[in-house]
Amino acid sequence: MATRDTRPVSWIAAARKAFEDFPVDARDTIVDALTVAADGGMARIVKPMKGLGSGVFEVALRHRGNAFRVVYAVQIDDDVWVVHAFVKKSTQGIRTPRNDIDLIKDRLKKLRVALQ
């Protein structure tokens, strides 16, 4: 049950749309991780995103041979903001592809402006 300290989870529309294409059981696991974030914690499948500033985290889930990723920010507003969801297909090992990093940066910038 949610406490009164639980923060709302808000989504950028494009991130929500991409997330809805994930398999149901992968979505359920990721929603559980986002719920932990909303309660002020950090699930074991979450790690800070390097190079994007403090308060930006990545949910990293390996599921049925795929690498599902959801990026969220906790220091933009009172909400936990999900800014990107994607299936990682990097040929660079564990590194997040540059185009995804650029997209995350752009969405974070636009979100900060929109919420001012």
Task: Describe each PLM feature range.
Residues 1-67, 76-79, 87-116:
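Basic, Lys/Arg-enriched alpha-helical interface segments
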Residues 83:
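Electropositive, glycine- and tryptophan-enriched low-complexity nucleic-acid-binding patches
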